[in-house]
Amino acid sequence: MRSGKSVRTIAVSGAALLALAACGGGSDDNGGSSSGGSDEKQINVYGTDGNVGDPLGEQFSEKGALEGMKGTTPLTDLSQEFRDRLLKVDPKLGNTFNYAGESYDAVVITALASAMAQSNQATVFGPYVNGVTFGGDKCEDFKSCMDIIAKGGNPDYDGVTGPLAFADPGEPAVASFGTLQFGPDNKLDPDLTEYLVVGDEENAATNEGPAAAPFGSGDGKGALKIGMLLPLTGSLAFLGPPEVAGVTLAVNEINEAGGVLGAPVELVPGDSGDTSTNIATQTVASHQQAGVNAIIGAASSDVTKTVIDTVTQAGILMFSPANTSDSFTTYADNGLYFRTAPPDIMQGQVLADLITKEGNQSVGILAQNGEYGTGLAQVIADNLENAGLGEDVVKQVYYDPNASDFSDVVQQMVDLNPDAIVVIGFDESGRIIQVMNEQGVGPAR
């Protein structure tokens, strides 16, 4: 699955993370040093999974507006063969594959759990979800996993995003992250991408779930119906295409392999919008009427918070490919909420490690005021302070993502004059960075 790019492994033990092997590439120098001998300070700018992607660069017409900006996102070194399969579903994806693998794996895991339970009812197959990601016979695609189930075995699905190995809360104990960097054309430079494997399979759950139902006993009792709740509109719409492609590809390939419960998996499209609308609520209501058994989504942690109770209390499984808020780890979800995206405790350490590794001694964090922004900002700040930066040199500033003007919050960064600024946001990040560039604290060279 790896393509030879730099890879690091970080192990998680409780709340601590330990770097086991450093990646190459010679990026240990401080990118925040002054440029060309000038006394003017070049501030390092970092992003996160909500904004680091080529769609951010499309908001800028001036060359070099994002040059040198770095960021982290849950990302696997996807094989070219898998990317080609995604591009057949959506040729317009280009080089944007954020959460495509996680979306694909969420569907496959759901289908395998349904096959193990021989039921399309989420309250019946939900207890099997964690167990198909660890402990059994290794398999890397739906068909080979189904062959194991058909013979009475338990599959250990190692999907396109890695070993997975879900922990008790229904989330990965191991995850892959990408460290990304924008070039002078305001696009991500794939040659500068580095991958980090984070976590420890020893933290996976130990209970593999109930014994499998007799294979074939669920045939003819109803098809597995999956609804999408992914961002086709709103502030995260740039993540929609790769996620939709991942879900669509998975359903297509499952059905090509014979489907589940003796029938093709049925896929129902659906938009999540964002928190400025009630689109997610409307989509969930529509999915309930359609009789879906599982919902893939939402992408935004804040959007998920608006509908998770409705979904899980209705006995529908909810499986997010992109939620990262730590709050879902302990959320009361009736055992029906799962995610292939790793929690913020992992991304916060990865980004803090990058920031300190590059020599930054003071950091400003600009984060949208919501479940996603405040949670990730706090994790990053905690990790920076644990790395030796004092509270007085790590400042968090929260903003309204629906604001029409971001001058005030950017001015706080100007006044702070830090070595590094982290922007935690979605589509509005482009407007914030534009103001940062105008005020001399952005990534523009």
Predicted regions and their residues:
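Extracytosolic ligand-binding ectodomains
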Residues: 2-9, 13-14, 20, 24-445
